[in-house]
Structures are given as C-alpha cells and as structure tokens.
Amino acid sequence: MQTKDIAELLNEPACTHNTKSKSGCARPKPGATAGGCSFDGAQIALLPIADVAHIVHGPIACAGSSWDNRGTRSSGSTLFRIGMTTDLTEQDVIMGRGEKRLFHAIKQAVNTYSPAAVFVYNTCVPALTGDDISAVCKAAAEQCGVAVVPVDCAGFYGTKNLGNRIAGDAMFKHVIGTAEPLPVPPASQRDGITVHDVNLIGEYNIAGEFWNVLPLFDELGLRILCSLSGDARFREVQTMHRAQANMVVCAKALLNVARKLQTDYQIPFFEGSFYGVTDTSQAFREFAQLLNDPSLTARTEAMIAREEAKINTLLDPWRDQLRGKRVLLYTGGVKSWSIVSALQDLGLEVVATGTNKSTEEDKARIREIMGEKTKMITDGSPKALLGAVKEYQADILIAGGRNMYTALKARIPFLDINQEREFGYEGYSGMTELARQLALTLQSPVWEAVRQPAPWVINHA
C-alpha cells in the first residue's frame, strides 16, 4: 500500500476532529505497542463474515497468534472458524515463492471448502518482499470462478484502528455494490407495514448478543440487508448499497464505510448503541426518524414502551443489589460511553472510563452522559489502572481480557467486557445478563476469603 493511500485512510472527513488545524487520526507514539497492528484490525473486522475463506498470507505466527480472538457467533456457516495461511518460510522468501504459494492456497481453499468468496490478508513479510497480492487474487478469481478480495493490511502500516479502515475500504472497493438484494419474501410482508432495508456497520455479534435485538427489527418491519460483519454472509455485504438507512455501532472501526455509502449512494447514517435500555430505545427511534415513516414511528414507540416496562420489572431486584456500587470502566471506542449508559441504567456509579481508542465524538458523548468533570483514563498500564482503582475507590474493574490478571492479582472484582467474553449484553434482554454477571462478580464469597491474612500469618502473630 502506498504512503498516500495510508494518509487518505487516516484522514476521515466524517470525524469532527478533521475540522481542527491538525486533521486526521493521531499517529501511534513510539513504544505504544499494546493494541494490535493493522493486520489484526483488518482481520477482526472481516473474520465474522461466515461463508468466506479467510487466508492469511505470511508466516504461520501471523495466523496462529491471532486467530478467532473475537468471540463472534454465526447462525449458519462455520467456515470462518477454519484458520488458513500460506505459512511462508525463510526458504520461500529467499526463493521468491510467496506469490506461487498464495495462488495454490487460494485454489486449495476453493476446491476443499467451496466458499462464497476468498479474502486474502497481506502481512509484513510479503509486503516487504513485494508480493503483488492484487495480481495474484485477480488471476485466481479468473481461474477459480470465485471472488478473491485482496486486503492489503501489513502490520507495519499502523495501528489496529487503521486496519479496521483498510478492511472497510477493501469491502467498499471490491464487494459492496456487486450484487442486488433479493425481493422481500411474502412471509415477511404484512398489511399496512412497509418493509425498510437497513444496514448495521461495526456490529460484530459478540457472544451472539445481536440475536437479542434481531427479533425487534423483524417486528418493526426493518429488514437487515447486512450486519458488517457479525453473522454476515458475502452476498449480504454485496447488497449494502441498497439500504435506506445505516447505523454505525463502532464509529472508529468502519465509519469510512458509512461515510462512503452516504456520499456515493445517499444513504443516511447515525451512530448508536444497543447497550443499555436508554440507548437501545434511542437507536430504534433514530431509525424511525431517518426512514420518515409515520407508521414505523408509531410501532417503534409502542414496542419501546412495552419492552421498557417489561425489562424494568425484571431489573428492579438487580438494581436493589447493585445500586451505589462504584465502577472503573477501562475499554475503548463505542463501549467507553455505551457501557456507561448501561451501568447507569442499573444504578451503578461509573467513577472513570477509559478513552484510549475513543474518537472525539465518543468523548463528547461521555461528557454528555457523565458530566464535564468526568475522569477519562488513557494510560492502561497495570500500575496506572490499580492506582485509579485505589484513587476512585472503585468496587469493580470492568475491562478487557488483558487486564484480567492485573485485577485478580490485586484481589479486585473483575468483569470482562471486551470481544473475548462469553456473555451477550446487547438489547433489553441483554441487560438482565449484564446485571446478573455484575451481581455474581461483586457478591462472590471469594473476595472476602482472599483478602483475609493467610493462616500462617495469623498463627505467627
């Protein structure tokens, strides 16, 4: 990838910070290695597309050390769970066999699994040796009769967030707009209800949590053309250009896709979240507002009133147990504010939140929810996190899996909120699961036990 192409991806017109004198995303600082590379970002953005063969072109470690690190779920094909790599060795590099190995890997994947398409992820070694993956993908597509999409995402290009944008750019250039959606099936048509086509961008169906919300879309007459990329299929991605409205769930990841769909196809979009009662209701209201259908607006308000009444009845016992507990939230992106809203719905007090991967829009939403004097944390080192827990007198640390052992070694209750988790928290029904996990964590008898002096210390005293 050329330097000018990387600079263009870093410069996102849809971000508000582009209006400042120094526009574009901040470049990574030397030594700031935590957080993943461009390859990691591109792979986790596209890997949930379930019926595609995902081939990592590079040494075995690039695939082996990162495969399936996003806990997405599929309702059908499980092809995306199969790790494929060209497994480049030192001899392959010396002899210049990289392109040949890639071509044969694509053929083998097509012959063995008959995928809907093949995605090829470029990594550092073949990028440095100059393998022309675009030419190889084009030749393989002509011979195999299957779409082969090059994703040029070598790790040294930049950060994980840049990789997300590279993935979105590849989808827009090579996939979106290459097929038309099927007509609405008769079973989905109801008298007096107009079916509207919508997309979700940056929704990854972690732990199957989007399935909590999907029935509500069906009830309202909203047909999801594509959820990029949780539980998605290749053909669904091809038809995204025919939606009437888009919802961006994770702004920092795939905002460029929403912006280009708006520019080229005049599809309006909004940024929202399905975490928490308030934000879930607001997301459906935003869809109704963008689609400008009075009947849809009426159905939406009726559905929201019903679901909120039902979930509030279920949450009241949990709120009695959780009210007043202090939470330190260290995550990033959309979760830095959407999880805050969900926790506040449960009566917890969020004393500080992490903003290491949050956009300017995310930070503005945090201030709107928590107030102008809210504490934002950018240093995620173990020492800094433990210091923040002590300073703000937090009862629990909610963060990603990499911070789990930091909390447990310090005998601090911990709840995993990032992509590796096993529980889904989206939608109205997801709130009961979030409340249950918080209560189980905070009320576990293990914390009282581990904070007691060891028996030999007591005996010695």
Where are these regions (language model features)?
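An N-terminal assembly and electron-transfer interface module characteristic of large anaerobic redox
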Residues: 1-461
